[in-house]
Amino acid sequence: MAQTKPIAEQMAALNNSDDTSFAADRSNSLLNATCPARIQNSVDQRKINRSFNDSLSSGYSGKWLRPKREALKITPLAQIDEAPATKRHSSAKDKHTEYKTRLCDAFRREGYCPYNDNCTYAHGQDELRVPRRRQEYYSRDPPRERRDSRSRRDDVDTTINRSSSSASKHHDENRRPSNNHGSSNRRQICHNFERGNCRYGPRCRFIHVEQMQHFNANATVYAPPSSDCPPPIAYYHHHPQHQQQFLPFPMPYFLAPPPQAQQGAPFPVQYIPQQHDLMNSQPMYAPMAPTYYYQPINSNGMPMMDVTIDPNATGGAFEVFPDGFFSQPPPTIIS
């Protein structure tokens, strides 16, 4: 059995050992961590082992090589700024002299500015500079010909008038026109006034026509003269040669008999229209109990009596109506 060496001899042998192999270093790792004497030389010994292993492993191509660890290089700040101080200050002056067009408030109040030469404001009247014009830095087009303010105002007024005239065509048809409009617009009838909602009143450029009683001169009324005769059918006959005339009122207007006609004469039979005229007539009325009739009114405000001659009649006699005939209502329409 081999005799074991004391611990002191083993420690001395380990400190003086020339074994630089990776196995020896690994076997002594526990001892290096527990022995204080070994810790001091472990760093230097490890560097030597790495350099030796690198030299040995360089000859073998199949062995994996550890990457070399290089120390971080820290460059001082003084070496980073390679430009000298004089050059830095001169470039700052050249750069900021363009902006020294106002006095520095801090330098004017306290006599000291923390920015020193880097300040963009002037430190005193000697550094104060006049601002340069824009033409020196930027190329500008030649100045345009200036016009008088009055001519420009006239152009603006013309543009406004054109825009307002184009907008007025679509805004409202009853808008009050200007003086340059023709008088043809006055001949048109205001439809808003007929509906009763014209907001322009007398200032409207369209005609405000009051709805008055219009009478059709081609209308003829056929009715029984008295209650003694059998009740025939009353017709409102409109002659076909005047059918193109439009009567804008829903109810027909009847004509009064002439004043020179004989009162109380029987209603002539020949005045009843023929069959073809009845087919061309517009409405047909049933015999109802009348209460009032419309009568035309002349310029003096008095009822005006008129006469109508039926061209289809065989004789030349006039139509005769009894007293109070036109004070009764018209007959109802048979639908």
From Swiss-Prot:
- Assembly, per entry: Interacts with hda-1, let-418 and mep-1. Interacts (via C terminus) with cit-1.1 (via C terminus).
Stretch list, region Disordered: 130-188
- Listed result of changing residue 68 to R: Abolishes pie-1 sumoylation, reduces the sumoylation of hda-1, reduces interaction of hda-1 with mep-1, reduces fertility, reduces embryonic viability and increases histone acetylation in gonads
Picking any one GO biological process from the record gives:
negative regulation of protein phosphorylation
| Name recorded for this polypeptide | Pharynx and intestine in excess protein 1
Domain note: The C3H1-type 1 domain is required for degradation in somatic blastomeres.
* Description of post-translational modifications: Sumoylated in adult germ cells.
- CC per GO annotation: centrosome; cytosol; nucleus; P granule; spindle
Basic and acidic residues: which segments have biased composition? 130-156
Give the species this sequence originates from: Caenorhabditis elegans
Superkingdom of origin organism: Eukaryota
What PANTHER family does this protein map onto?
CCCH ZINC FINGER/TIS11-RELATED, PHARYNX AND INTESTINE IN EXCESS PROTEIN 1
Q: Name one GO molecular function term.
A: DNA binding
Q: What happens when the gene is disrupted?
A: Disrupts blastomere cell fate. Excessive pharyngeal cells produced during embryogenesis. Reduced expression of nos-2 in P4 germline blastomeres and absence of nos-2 protein. Does not affect embryo viability or brood size of animals. Abolishes the sumoylation of hda-1.
Its lineage reads: Eukaryota, Metazoa, Ecdysozoa, Nematoda, Chromadorea
Q: Which UniProt keywords apply?
A: Cytoplasm, Cytoskeleton, DNA-binding, Isopeptide bond, Metal-binding, Nucleus, Repeat, Repressor, Transcription, Transcription regulation, Ubl conjugation, Zinc, Zinc-finger
Per UniProt, the C3H1-type Zn-finger stretches lie at 98-126, 184-211
**Role played:** Maternally provided pie-1 is required for germline cell fate determination. Functions as a repressor of RNA polymerase II-dependent gene expression in the developing germline. Required for expression of nos-2 in P4 germline blastomere cells. Inhibits the histone deacetylase activity of hda-1. Represses transcriptional activation of cdk-9 and cit-1.1, which are members of the P-TEFb complex. Acts redundantly with gei-17 to promote piRNA-mediated silencing and fertility in adult germline.
According to the record, the residues making up region (Required for inhibition of Ser-2 phosphorylation) are 288-291
The record's section on InterPro entries has: ZFP36-like, Znf_CCCH, Znf_CCCH_sf
